[in-house]
Amino acid sequence: MDLGGDKGEKGMGKGIVEKILREHLVEGEYKVGEEIGIKIDQTLTQDATGTMAYLQFEAMGIDRVRTDLSVSYVDHNTIQVGFENADDHKYLQSVAAKYGILYSRAGNGICHQVHLERFGKPGTTLLGSDSHTPTGGGIGQIAIGAGGLDVALAMGGDPFYLTCPRVIKVNLTGSLNPWVSAKDVVLKILEIFTVKGNVGSVLEYGGPGVKTLSVPERATITNMGAETGVTTSIFPSDEETRRFLKAQGRENDWKRIEADPDAEYDRVVDVDLSKIEPLVAVPHSPGNVKTVRSVAGIDVDQVCIGSCTNSSYRDLMIIAKILKGKRVHPNVSAVMAPGSRQVLMMLAENGALNDIIAAGVRVAENACGFCIGNSQSPPSKGVSVRTSNRNFEGRSGTKDAQVYLVSPETAAATMITGKLTDPRDLGIPYPEVKMPERFIIDDSMILPPAEDPSRVQIYRGPNIGEPPKNDPLPPDIDGVVTIKVGDKITTDHIIPAGARMKYRSNVPKYSEFLFEIVDPKFYERAMKIKNSGKVNIIVGGVSYGQGSSREHAAICPMFVGVKAVITKSFERIHSANLVNFGIVPLTFVNEGDYDRIDQGDEIEIRNLREALKNGNKISVRNRTKGLEFEVKHDLSRRQVDIILAGGSLAYVKVKKG
């Protein structure tokens, strides 16, 4: 269906988001702020979140995925130190073969880059167990990151539930100047919207500036838009989209999707592309945006190019052209990780890879690698300049490292000079990169499912355990504040990636590293409280649960007996994950009450089950301090029922008898 001119009710025009969501609506009413359920056409998983997602899918007892397309990618845990990663990959490959899922082998590339190249379809819905799934918005797809359990449910044919979003139009005008690229655009978006206060919103790009951006550039913008906390971001599907799909041999997947001229939005933000200059996110948040020139001159130890944000053919060709005939500064360790095998093969064929290697850049495999902190950790107190999307403290694998997020152009300039450098100051002409009319297409590392699933044996190594089970929510909570944390606590703070990520399939072991970065004694304290018969309660500040979609930031707290998290505000994916695992997400009615609670305080919530069912305000008593305060929730009726049952798996079993 061509969605270029589909009118809404009473002749009102519709935007892209509304058109696609209405077409996929299966539950609820399309009304901003209300819960809706949408049909999911495609799913993707990556190996760090995928093992648990497929274990949960198996527990549902369904014999075949019920989506149009589901793909299992291996791109996170590709450094085999010990048996765990290899065992997980064998499990994932066998599950994919048995249940009708495509399997993208290690080395084929980063899930978002490969999916954009080979599977993304305008006008469809994509749910991925990775927070940067909105990359698909660059091709005109409603692409949303979620926890693995939500993805498992979607694979089983259930709707995906979300709050019907406020839609913010980002009206792009003008065109980018030389040495300014899509990464600078999304850093400008982060400067405008910040990393908090955007839950329940979607960014819809439009305006005359859109046609000046290629699909990979658009995908860079929608990818890192995840850092604002929006549900997703999306671009129109136009002739530029058609050219990209034709070059991928997929022109038949194209359809035009544009907003109606009279579409209405909750807000319109104008961005003049011609006024953007090279930008950088300084430590320790993607929202700490400054101009490169304002912080230029910092000595740099490391430059890393790649990640799902900036590892496309266009990005790496820019790097190659800037580096051609030059050398990486002797004080800089430089590494490049292509986003896909297709990109690497293109660079090898046209000679660009030789230019990169000749300059002194190390070439890593086509994977996430340094971005998630499981390789290329910087030196102690080192400065690392990266083209990735997150610079949270400790995420690089080095707790005291300073990580700066930049465009490929700025990264290449910095490699050469050894200092953080505005690329305009290199004094050379801006390289021109022409997108190929035809990409190299070789899908031999994407394995189809078995023709006869009954003959497939699921491989389960010792690292693969059963999904942990939770009890129904008790009538009352008698607990202890196990930890009190501040604002902008990320899922990296809650449960680290990096070297610990190989334990993702082993929840009891992985739980030992809860809050390791913040408080190494948390696990010991939590287990002591649990074993005493009390429950654990976490208290946090603003935007609790930023960052990665990893549901282990909810599964592991559930395992150690956390029953409630009380904060000033939550980020969307983490709040949904808490619900999925039977943990109650509560917020302070009066934020000042945060200051009246301390770690170790004994907390009680009487008649919690009844309170959840009957209203959104709940009374909490701090027995240690002898005071009471109110908290609230914004859960739907369905979410309340999930929590009462002890989580989504238990709820589904009750619902389906």
Residue ranges and their predicted role:
Residues 3-4, 8-657:
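Fe-S-dependent hydro-lyases/dehydratases of central metabolism
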